[in-house]
Amino acid sequence: MAKSYLWMLLLLFSLALAACTKDGSTIYQVNPDEEKPSTAPLVTVIYGPNSLGDRSYCDKIYRGVEASASKHGIRTLHLMPESMEQGLTYLEMIFQQMESAQDSVSRLFIATSPVYDEFIRKNNRRLESNSFADLLYLETSTPLEGKGSTLYIDYYGAMYMAGCLSPHDDFDLLLLVLANPYTQSVVEAGEGFVDGYNSVTPKIEKPLNIKYLSNEPGGGFQLADTTALRIFEETQRYVYDKVCVVPVCGGAMNAFFRIMPDNSYYISIDDYIPIKRCENRINVIKNIDTVLNNYIEQWIDDTMPKHQTLGLDDGGTDLYFTKGTGWLEDEDVDVDGVRQIAIRKEGERYEK
């Protein structure tokens, strides 16, 4: 019964691909008078469950892919499952469609989340039967055996800078919220921030509290507003404490924004979103949109690398200072010096 259900979904999915495609940001129906279906390259992206609309990492991926689609005239399909089970069903359908395709249409499948790691590594060789199909797997530092490319953007250096510079801001304590203690990008971001914070000399006495949203691998990437509010309130030692939130988790750029009291302190993660009622002088940026734009160009030119690890030195990450760096220079902080230390420490981790 389950097998019949899967084939029914595959049939419906194939019909959807044939009936409604996406070229850049324009959705159109196939003209029945056309003699041949489109042969334009197709990029399909799958996101983690309920992750689009996060105003950070996933939304930047969407923008990067669509910018490339508009530039190169490729078709795109974005899939956001409601659950892990639905995500695995989507993956199986995509792999079946790509490995069995009889045409010469170039197809790139982008898996954006490490929650699909087991499936990707068990099934990537299936695509070797189609020389026009390729795979790009994000958020892993371990290359695939067999077909497919991998890309990892290391947050250690940028978060080291943020941890080193943030204590100079005008708040009472730091709250570092991490999704879980297992996801590599989250763990390394946390390590970078803590190492940077501990490197400040002379020591600035501002407590650093660390909170994990989940103890499960892959957990902590969905966050209700009520949970965000509870975490924030539990951190305050006193009602008048000024807490600076550093969220490397689900809800980083939406749930926490909605519950933060006026004049709160915040370090934006992945993207910069101006908030008039909050102080977010430091913003840690992951340039996944521009990186993906470049990757798709390399895929079109058949030069996509097998694996790359990018970071602060490569432009994969950066810091954006909302109000410039004058407030740091007033305290004789050498921002460029901190950057060079962060780049060196990040490079030592990956032997760059």
Task: Annotate each predicted stretch with a short phrase.
Residues T21-I27:
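Bacterial lipoprotein signal-peptidase II cleavage site
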